[in-house]
Structures are given as C-alpha cells and as structure tokens.
Amino acid sequence: MRVIILKNSNETAKWSAYRIAKEMLKFKPTPEKPFVLGLPTGSTPLKTYKELINLYNEGIISFENVITFNMDEYVGLSPDNKQSYHYFMHEHFFKFINIKPENINIPNGMATDLEAECQRYEDKIKSFGGITLFLSGVGEDGHIAFNEPGSSLSSRTRSKELTHDTILANSRFFDHDVEKVPKLALTVGVGTLLDSKEILTIINGYKKSQAAYYGIEGSVTQMWTISALQLHRKALLIVDEDAVSDLKVKTYRYFKDIESKNIDLEKMKEELLTYK
C-alpha cells in the first residue's frame, strides 16, 4: 500500500486527478480496448472531478474511450431525481466531458428485480475485463461505497440496508431530513472493489482520521471496510495532513519520507504532457 500525504483537500484532488490522467494516457484507450474507470459520489471526489474536467478542457485527456462504473445508487430514486447518483454524476462530471452516454454505468435503483440488477452489473464489469482504476472516498466509519461496518470482505454487488450513521450523514443532501433519505441502496461489494487493478482512495479531514488509522495501521477487519485495502496489491491512499492525525509519528514519517519525491504537483502535471 502506498500512502501519499499532502497538505489539504486541494492538493489531494490535484494529485488524484493527475494520477488518473497519467494512467489513462499510459493505457492509450481505444474503442476495442477502453479504459474502465470506477467512480464514487459524495463530497470527497468533487474537487477531483473539477481537476479532471480542467485537464479535459486543456486538451490533455479525453474520455471518448473511457467506460465508467459508479459504486452505488439509492433504491427507489429515479435517474432524474436530484438526489440520485445518476443526477449527481451528470451535474458534477459527465456533462462537462466527452464521455459517451452508452459508456456510463450506474446501478439501476428502480429495477424491479434488485438481485438480477446486481448480477447484471457484476457481469457487465467482468465483460470489460474488470475495473482498470477505481477512485473512492471513505466514510467516517471506514465504509467504502455502501459497504457498511460488518460487510463481508468478499461481498459482491448487492442491495444493502444503510446504517443510521450513514443515513444521518447523507441527510445533508435531503434537506437535513433523515426521513427523506432512502434506507436501501445498491452497491458494489468489497470483493468487487478488490478485483480492480488499482484502487485510489481519497481521505480528507480530522473527522476521517480514525478511518485513515484503521486503513493504514489497523488490522484487517469487516468492521472497518477500508482495512481491506491492505490486501490489495496496488492500493493508493491519498490523504491530507488532518486525516493522518491519528497515525503513529513513526508511520507518518515513514510515508512522508518514502513518497517525498512523488508529491510535486507541478512536475506531475508537466509529466502528463510527455504522454501526449
């Protein structure tokens, strides 16, 4: 596992966007060999999406041959519902880039047969050879996507009942009314996530410092979904200074030292031009 420690959320967003762009450019996607990108929603990735949009507008990257799979969707919300993740992704990312509508994949929370929908989603991911890079955020309790504490670390895409803490946290998107928040969602599983060739997880802020601790120093446990990333051969944790406040000083110094040559944002962006 690599841990990249940066000053703040602006820097974690830039680093993450530049990393994604680099992998896309190195991959050289074509219609026959698309780059498959896994995406999250929520507040964490917003700045990263803006940075990716900037790179697209500057002509550095293209999404023409990129296929996306989102992590999750609420059950019972139609795609045109302003609180749905379909709507979120369109308004914050997709409408600003040149991705083809048919290349966008988000679980169908309106499906009449949720189990069949989850299997269809898994099968479609596999049909493209799996996720090339999965971008993710993490909750204060360490959940990734809607894999709440206690989720099986080998779980696949499925419907999941949301915990009270998650409902409470997400109520900020529903006029701070917990009664308006759906109680069920479709989510990729931890096993689905771990099948990705690379996982890039952004962690910002003091409130998520405990999640960062369990992800980096804790034991692997189903009670902290983020800890499963320790099992992945190519996991990247992109964290700001506030998020690593619970780490041991020795751990902090180790990662700051070993990654010291890999945090120059200007150099990272300049490097992208060499792949054009």
Regions found by a protein language model. Give the residues of each.
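Glycine-rich beta-strand-to-loop/alpha-helix junction loops that act as flexible
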Residues: L39-T44, V138-E140, N204
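N-terminal glycine-/serine-/threonine-rich phosphate-binding loop
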Residues: M1-L37
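A glycine- and small-aliphatic-rich helix-loop capping segment at beta-alpha/alpha-beta transitions
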Residues: K50-S62, Y85-Y87, P149-R158, G218
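Class I SAM-dependent methyltransferase SAM-binding "motif I" and its flanking Rossmann-like core
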Residues: A145-V190
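Ligand-binding beta-strand-loop-alpha-helix segment within the catalytic cores
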Residues: I61-L133, T251, K256-K267, Y275
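Glycine-rich N-terminal segment of FAD-binding domains in flavoprotein oxidoreductases
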Residues: K26-N57
